[in-house]
């Protein structure tokens, strides 16, 4: 999309969704075609600048602004390239490769959060008031640092939401602002709708019970429990799914719909070895 990085990235993700649908329908050729198109996000990545950059209609790069990727509405709407550039949910390994590898990407992602204000209100870095970044705290899980997902989701839950009038950090926007909180406070959230994977993070509550609808689920309830939960205990030390040790930082949608229980042991310090499988 000439001039628009945000739309180019969203179209690439949409093509990936279509490839998944086509695969499920048995349309192999269409699935392969749309999967290949979903890799088009790389065409708006400028290796010289080390980040996504809009192109002109003739394929040349648009002039790079003095503020760089922090320039408001340069190649996107109501945001900047630093915020929009993390939207490759369907190919995070490929995105990280473009950005210089996992270690460099992780450092840049950490910088993205460390420079934002404590209330996460409108700013040039992680801006929770604007929904395009809502999946970004969970990218730490995908990059091999789940303790940072745990830290930042707890910080956002505490800093961007208040139990008062105007308690949301931004416009509700069709329920997304509240939906993010509900899922994150329960301890799981999707990064890539179209996948059945949910990223795990630290629940806010000692116990949550989800009643399942028997029209769609095999189970009746999915229970989330924590041991050692406290305001400062934002780090997962270990987890169990239906009584068995869980070493992954994610679960599948079917784990919820089958019913059962997931439990977390929490502490005020990170466990750098949990969730790396």
Which functions belong to the PLM regions below?
Residues 1-204, 208-223, 254, 261:
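Active-site core of glycosidic bond-cleaving carbohydrate-active enzymes
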Residues 247-252:
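Short, solvent-exposed S/T- and G/P-enriched segments that are highly enriched in secreted/extracellular
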Residues 241-244:
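Short strand-turn-strand beta-turns centered on an Asx-Gly dipeptide
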Residues 215-217, 231, 246, 269-271:
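Generic "edge-of-domain/loop-turn" microfeature
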